[in-house]
């Protein structure tokens, strides 16, 4: 699928970083796909070969449906599943990027040319704890306005499971009390002074927006301590599967994606639904992009 990760707010989806791809179709045709102007792609589409026939069909689809796609296709960018229809209405059409969301239904990618990104010089974390999970989602737009590199959510279930594992006791010591949700906000920077300014700006904005936290924010500049925080976040999925008994969190609401401004509505609705069935759910992952893993 069109995967990405914690830093998608900086780097986008896989498709956003694909320059070109060599693909193989079910009929045996093997060829290179990449970006091009309408004239360039039309010229290639006039060739009587596998690539030409594919491009002719894609360009015909684009001409017929681009207005409908632009008008009615959901605008939120953080989708890893389903065909990337918005590729058809971008200023420069790149057919190779359609393969990133096709899950093998278009063909097989044999090789790809992709963009590279610079590894950050320094990073910092600000850990924010909330008494209510919905409150953490409501706070996310304010945090996002401070231009972090990532905002990751950990919920009470994940925290409780991690605390129960002796191997993670020291890594999770940064969490105080029993918060319903914890947001780990990461910043990139060239110097420690720059990182401190960014962290201070975030704290100022939280105070100005009157966002209620369950405890004081924690600023983490030390690389080892940051690694401990991320180790707790990454351990979550495996620990969810370690729950004993017949009832376990399962991925039935996976990769749910909506604009950050409305994500709290989804969380509130799911919380009410699972409570109605006297159950619970795990919520974690990419708050910054409006994309959570929700496992009742």
Task: Label the model's feature ranges.
Residues 87-92, 96-296:
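C-terminal substrate-recognition/cap domain of FAD-linked oxidoreductases
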Residues 1-140:
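FAD-binding subdomain of flavoenzyme oxidoreductases
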């Amino acid at each position: 699928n069109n995967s990405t990760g914690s830093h998608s707010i900086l780097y986008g989806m896989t498709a956003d970083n694909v320059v070109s791809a060599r693909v193989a179709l079910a009929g045996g045709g093997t060829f290179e796909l990449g970006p091009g102007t309408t004239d360039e792609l039309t010229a290639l589409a006039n060739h009587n070969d596998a690539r030409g026939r594919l491009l002719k069909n894609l360009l015909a689809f684009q001409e017929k449906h681009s207005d409908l796609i632009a008008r009615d296709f959901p605008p939120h960018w953080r989708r890893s599943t389903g065909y990337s229809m918005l590729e058809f209405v971008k200023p420069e059409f790149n057919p190779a990027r359609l393969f990133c969301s096709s899950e093998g239904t278009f063909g097989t990618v044999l090789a790809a040319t992709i963009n590279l990104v610079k590894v950050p010089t320094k990073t910092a974390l600000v850990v924010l704890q909330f008494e209510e999970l919905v409150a953490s989602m409501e706070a996310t737009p304010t945090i996002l306005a401070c231009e972090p590199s990532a905002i990751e959510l950990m919920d009470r279930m994940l925290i409780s499971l991690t605390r129960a594992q002796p191997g993670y006791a020291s890594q999770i010591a940064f969490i105080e009390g029993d918060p319903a949700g914890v947001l780990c906000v990461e910043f990139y920077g060239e110097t420690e002074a720059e990182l401190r300014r960014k962290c201070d700006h975030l704290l100022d904005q939280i105070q100005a927006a009157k966002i209620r936290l369950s405890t004081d924010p924690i600023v983490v500049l030390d690389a080892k301590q940051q690694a401990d925080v991320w180790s707790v976040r990454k351990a979550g999925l495996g620990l969810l599967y370690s729950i004993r008994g017949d009832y376990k969190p399962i991925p039935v609401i996976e990769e749910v994606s909506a604009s950050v401004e409305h994500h709290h509505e989804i969380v509130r609705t799911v919380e009410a639904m699972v409570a109605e069935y006297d159950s619970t759910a795990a919520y974690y992952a990419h708050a910054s992009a409006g994309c959570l893993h929700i496992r009742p």
